[in-house]
């Protein structure tokens, strides 16, 4: 996401995404919402380069919206606190607050009640099945039972985590199930799961070398990439403390 301040109040998207009207773009919505609530007379030009697949369950749109709020908080010299931006971001989507929070977190509610947690350093092999999963359709599925026992802190550990959506998505999208099956036969993984509502799936590794060996063995017909886990958002200091 690249942002350029305008002296007028216009909010302009320079890089529209095919199939997504500008008014539906979360970066545009974030900028307009912050402009309205802050009362600033400034505007912004937004350039967006998508590096991860849409409909992959990776939170790309929410992350872009959070980045827009954090950056404009500084560029427009608003000096809002992290908590204020998180509350505003919740209007854009349940996943936006965690990206503003800027730390690994245990989430409750719809994702807005966040508590920081410490995670060990890790690398992730992310596979991208060639399907687009509709989050709305998955949550509306009769196969989603919603009867999982809630997990609380302090007993929580990553090993206790479970994605209730995974079995529903695998039933509706066999390609997702096939990619998960391939990851589960790998050695030296510490976790294999689906991202959010899919379609992407991932395997966690403690070392970069193990992750790169797994990436090198991805078969023809599958594609993926490596990422390193972060414990702190690089823009975490773009807000006022308190």
What are these model-derived regions, one by one?
Residues 1-56, 74, 78-83, 110, ...:
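ATP-binding N-lobe of GHMP and related small-molecule kinases
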Residues 47-76, 191-205:
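Glycine/serine-rich anion-binding loops at beta->alpha junctions
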Residues 78-191, 204-242:
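ATP-dependent small-molecule kinase catalytic core of the GHMP/sugar-kinase superfamily
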Residues 7-20, 68, 90, 155-163:
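Short, basic/glycine-rich phosphate-binding loops at helix/coil junctions
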Residues 32, 67-74, 87-90:
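A broadly conserved amphipathic alpha-helix scaffold signal in soluble, globular proteins
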Residues 1-3, 27, 61, 127, ...:
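Residue-level signal for inorganic ion chemistry
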Residues 27, 57-63, 95, 104, ...:
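Gly/Ser/Thr-rich beta-alpha loop segments that engage phosphate groups in nucleotides
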């Amino acid at each position: 996401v690249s942002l350029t301040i305008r002296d007028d109040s216009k909010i302009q998207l320079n890089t529209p995404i095919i199939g997504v009207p500008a008014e539906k773009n979360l970066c545009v919505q974030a900028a307009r919402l912050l402009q309205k609530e802050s009362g600033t007379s400034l505007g912004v030009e937004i350039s967006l380069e998508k590096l991860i697949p849409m409909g992959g369950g990776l939170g790309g749109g929410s992350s872009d919206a959070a980045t827009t709020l954090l950056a404009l908080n500084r560029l427009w010299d608003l000096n809002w606190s992290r908590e204020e931006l998180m509350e505003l971001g919740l209007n854009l989507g349940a996943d936006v607050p965690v990206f503003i929070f800027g730390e690994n977190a245990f989430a409750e509610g719809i994702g807005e009640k966040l508590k920081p947690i410490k995670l060990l350093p890790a690398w992730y092999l992310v596979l991208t099945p060639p399907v687009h999963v509709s989050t709305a359709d998955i949550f509306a599925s009769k196969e989603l039972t919603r009867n999982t026992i809630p997990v609380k802190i302090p007993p929580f550990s990553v090993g206790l985590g479970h994605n209730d959506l995974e079995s529903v998505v695998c039933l509706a999208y066999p390609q997702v199930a096939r990619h998960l099956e391939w990851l589960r036969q790998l050695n030296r993984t510490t976790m294999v799961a689906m991202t959010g509502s899919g379609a992407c799936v991932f395997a966690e590794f403690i070392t970069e070398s193990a992750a790169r060996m797994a990436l090198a063995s991805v078969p023809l017909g599958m594609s993926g990439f490596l990422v390193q886990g972060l414990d702190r958002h690089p823009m975490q200091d773009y807000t006022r403390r308190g």
